[in-house]
């Protein structure tokens, strides 16, 4: 409620798409009443198992938000955001098919174009698909196969790290959370590129002092914090 009201106070007028797990449909009318009048419309949608096509919200074609069933004391979801990347544009093929230069960008953006009496599809002028980007957020969860599968080859995984020490694994399991080491081990098994630990318990006042519990299993583990930012780059851009 406070976040929605804050967005209104900041002058937001653009529509907001709000997604949530099972149960959202039941509580949304009451929550919307509590927010009071807002200067922007909200489209609330309950997520099941199907991915959300993000193209309608201005993302590139093929971008998806996938709900992940996680393991917590109450029904919970993590989320995987995937951004595919088309193959490299092959101008020689476009020329051979008679595609005007003015239409090349349409093909690069996944659109089919009309050339005289026939259509030319992107697949006819693009190389093999290139590696895209994947961002995964665990939400509150104990380690589970669904999260590990979703985090395969992720560029960035934000993972529950409620407890720091290995001796707290039983407590973490009881309450549906993870330790620093468990999240790091999951990231390593999944082949993630980066791991940010999040959702610390109040007992962890200095997360950096506990980071060694994670870096033994996953050296690229970092402590997440409010406002931390990272620009993810495609592989060609990363390696020059």
Question: What residue spans do the PLM features occupy?
Answer:
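Active-site HxH/HxHxD metal-binding segment of metal-dependent hydrolases
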Residues: 1-46
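A short helix-to-beta-strand connector/capping loop
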Residues: 14, 37-43, 60-63, 132-133, ...
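General small-molecule cofactor/ligand-binding pocket signal
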Residues: 19, 43-48, 66-68, 222-224
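Binuclear metal-ion centers of metallo-dependent hydrolases, dominated by the metallo-beta-lactamase
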Residues: 47-51, 145-240
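Active-site-proximal loop/helix segment associated with metal-binding centers of metalloenzymes
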Residues: 59-150, 156-158
């Amino acid at each position: 409620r406070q976040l929605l009201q804050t967005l209104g106070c900041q002058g937001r007028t653009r529509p907001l798409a709000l997604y949530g797990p099972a149960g959202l449909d039941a509580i949304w009318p009451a929550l919307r009443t509590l927010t009071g009048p807002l200067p922007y419309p909200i489209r609330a949608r309950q997520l099941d198992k199907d991915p959300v096509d993000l193209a309608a919200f201005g993302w590139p074609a093929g971008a998806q938000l996938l709900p992940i069933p996680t393991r917590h004391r109450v029904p919970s979801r993590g989320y995987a955001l995937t951004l595919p990347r088309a193959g490299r544009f092959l101008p020689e093929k476009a020329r051979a098919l008679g595609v005007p230069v003015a239409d090349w960008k349409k093909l690069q953006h996944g659109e089919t174009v009309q050339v005289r009496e026939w259509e030319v599809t992107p697949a006819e002028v693009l190389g093999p698909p290139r590696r895209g980007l994947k961002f995964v957020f665990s939400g509150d969860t104990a380690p589970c196969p669904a999260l590990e599968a979703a985090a395969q080859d992720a560029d960035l995984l934000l993972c529950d790290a409620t407890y720091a020490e290995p001796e707290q694994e039983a407590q973490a399991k009881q309450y549906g959370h993870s330790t620093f080491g468990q999240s790091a081990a999951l990231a390593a098994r999944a082949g993630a590129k980066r791991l940010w630990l999040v959702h610390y318990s109040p007992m962890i006042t200095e997360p950096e002092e506990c980071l060694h519990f994670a870096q033994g299993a996953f050296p690229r583990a970092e402590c997440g914090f409010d406002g931390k930012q990272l620009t993810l780059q495609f592989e060609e851009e990363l390696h020059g």
